[in-house]
Regions:
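Acidic, glycine-rich loop-and-strand cores that form catalytic or ligand-binding grooves
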Residues: 76-96, 162-187
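Conserved Nudix-box catalytic region and its N-terminal flanking loop in Nudix hydrolases
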Residues: 10-80, 151-160
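NUDIX/MutT-family hydrolases
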Residues: 90-109, 120-131, 135-159
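Short beta-strand scaffold segments in enzyme catalytic cores
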Residues: 1-3
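Charged mid-protein connector segments
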Residues: 66-115
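Core RNA-modification/binding signature centered on pseudouridine synthases
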Residues: 165, 172-258
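Short acidic-glycine loop/turn motifs at beta-strand connectors
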Residues: 5-10, 202-204
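Terminal peptide-recognition signature
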Residues: 50, 124, 169
């Protein structure tokens, strides 16, 4: 879940730090999110996980988006859900329901096929609701940060940002306002082209994205190349691991700002 706010005229993105004992991306700063529950669509998963991990509630009461007055009881609802009570039923008992439709699809990342542990992650973008402030759950997540997309990229090594977060921040940094980001997301459609990096052989880890010129000729593993070039598939097209940081770089011989 890509949660945004405007602070001092700058767009900032919200990150949470995963617990050091996590089985995947331990100690990394990531976007809030998690696994879907049975019969749960991706949007609902995103709003539920955001509420569980960060306490931000996208919900409605009698068709209206949650007001600040209603948010006052969100802490108690969150505790019930974290204690194991079904999220949708818990909200319903309080006269509320999640509003997943406010989320805008952004991207769909799939772990490279060469990895033993794999995920299919759909990223959505939304603006922080008025009157709410996120707070990490101190269980799965142990810290949090609001940073501009450009700051996130510059601090990628310190924050231990995984490639999907780095690439997403690169794309977000292309836009000056949240409105522009939301418009760009809507232009991508409800089913963005899946991004499954391929591993390139070499003396250091290198991941190729679907628009990289060597994605099909040099990359190993599965993954669907782009048969066309959408506007978002530009700039850096691969990741190289250097000094504990995934550096987002362009095909050799090209120039990039990322």
């Amino acid at each position: 879940m890509i949660l945004l706010r405007t602070e001092r005229g700058r767009v900032e993105v919200f990150l949470v730090r995963r617990h050091r004992g996590a089985s995947f991306m331990a100690s990394s700063y990531v976007f809030p999110g998690g696994a879907s529950e049975p019969n749960e669509d991706a949007r609902t998963t995103a709003v539920r996980e955001l509420f569980e991990e960060a306490g931000v509630l996208f919900a409605k009461d009698i068709g209206a988006v949650t007001e600040t007055l209603q948010v006052a009881s969100a802490g108690a609802l969150r505790k019930k859900i974290l204690a194991g009570n079904p999220a949708a039923e818990t909200l319903k008992l309080s006269g509320l329901a999640f509003t997943p439709d406010v989320l805008v699809p952004w991207s769909h990342w799939i772990t490279p096929s060469v990895e033993a542990k794999r995920f299919s992650a759909r990223f959505f973008v939304a603006e922080l609701p008025p009157g709410q402030e996120p707070q990490f759950d101190d269980s799965e997540t142990v810290d949090q940060a609001w940073v501009t997309p450009r700051e996130a990229i510059e601090r990628a090594a310190e924050l231990q940002l995984p490639p999907p977060q780095v690439r997403t921040c690169w794309e977000l940094a292309e836009h000056a306002t949240i409105a522009a980001i939301l418009a760009a997301g809507r232009a991508r459609g409800d089913e963005p082209h899946p991004i499954m990096p391929r591993l390139a052989p070499g003396d250091r880890p290198c991941l190729l994205l679907p628009w990289d010129p060597e994605y099909t000729t040099r990359g190993t593993g599965e993954g669907t190349p782009l048969t066309y070039r959408p506007s978002w598939a530009r700039g850096p097209s691969r990741f190289v691991l250097e000094d504990r940081r995934w550096k987002h770089v362009e095909f050799p011989g090209s120039t990039t700002r990322g």
